[in-house]
Amino acid sequence: MIVLVNNRDSFVWNLAEYASLFDRVKVVPNTITVGELRRLDPDGVIISPGPGHPLERREVGNSPEIVLEAGVPILGVCLGHQIIATAFGGKVGRVKPRHGKASPVKHDGKGVLRGIKNPLTAGRYHSLAVLEVPREFDVSAVSLDDNVVMGIRHRKLPIEGLQFHPESVLTEWERKEGLRIIKNFVEMSRNG
């Protein structure tokens, strides 16, 4: 089962729909505790997009603790990606707003990006981005039009973040590349 932590974004249900094609999905509020989450015994956790700043507790709930303590594979999308970065000591700041914009994204073809078109046209909906990557992470993807970090991956733990939205129609819809990214995460979660 995949647990999707809901940070109150309109894209939450698109992510849930994508993931449900490959496994059972339970959507939970971001106020769920790590203990409550562990009792659900998920194979993996998706930290959803949402409005606001990753350091604003009222907007992200217990998402940072989940990232650090859940002990299962984690994928963060947009705000979820930023939460991963800040939870591990990275910095997030303002960038030129990219709401409803598609950008070419070059990636390393590993992890959730395995087998994905490169460069990938990806849907972006953000005005914040990771400016300093935590030292335990590698940059896995970068936008080619403005050189913004679009993906990070922990060097040892199964934790990845994507600034772009794989569930957006702007992300290679015809080729189903966003769907493949979510499938890769579900498979990675099942395999531990």
Swiss-Prot record:
Tell me where in this chain the Glutamine amidotransferase type-1 domain is found.
1-192
Q: Name one GO biological process term.
A: L-tryptophan biosynthetic process
User: InterPro entries given for it?
Assistant: Anth_synth/Amidotransfase, Class_I_gatase-like, GATASE, TrpG/PapA_dom
Q: Tell me what reaction this enzyme catalyses.
A: chorismate + L-glutamine = anthranilate + pyruvate + L-glutamate + H(+)
Source domain of life: Archaea
Q: Which CDD domains match?
A: GATase1_Anthranilate_Synthase
Q: Report the active site residues.
A: 78 (nucleophile), 165 (for gatase activity), 167 (for gatase activity)
The catalytic activity of this protein is classed by the Enzyme Commission as 4.1.3.27
Q: Which UniProt keywords apply?
A: Amino-acid biosynthesis, Aromatic amino acid biosynthesis, Glutamine amidotransferase, Lyase, Tryptophan biosynthesis
Task: State the top-level EC class.
Answer: lyase
**Pathway membership, UniProt:** Amino-acid biosynthesis; L-tryptophan biosynthesis; L-tryptophan from chorismate: step 1/5
* Record flagged with keyword RNA-binding: no
GO MF, one term, reads:
anthranilate synthase activity
Q: Which Gene3D superfamilies match?
A: 3.40.50.880
On assembly, the entry states: Heterotetramer consisting of two non-identical subunits: a beta subunit (TrpG) and a large alpha subunit (TrpE).
| Function recorded in the entry | Part of a heterotetrameric complex that catalyzes the two-step biosynthesis of anthranilate, an intermediate in the biosynthesis of L-tryptophan. In the first step, the glutamine-binding beta subunit (TrpG) of anthranilate synthase (AS) provides the glutamine amidotransferase activity which generates ammonia as a substrate that, along with chorismate, is used in the second step, catalyzed by the large alpha subunit of AS (TrpE) to produce anthranilate. In the absence of TrpG, TrpE can synthesize anthranilate directly from chorismate and high concentrations of ammonia.
The name of this protein is Anthranilate synthase component 2
- Organism, by scientific name, is Thermococcus kodakarensis (strain ATCC BAA-918 / JCM 12380 / KOD1)
Gene name of the encoded protein: trpG
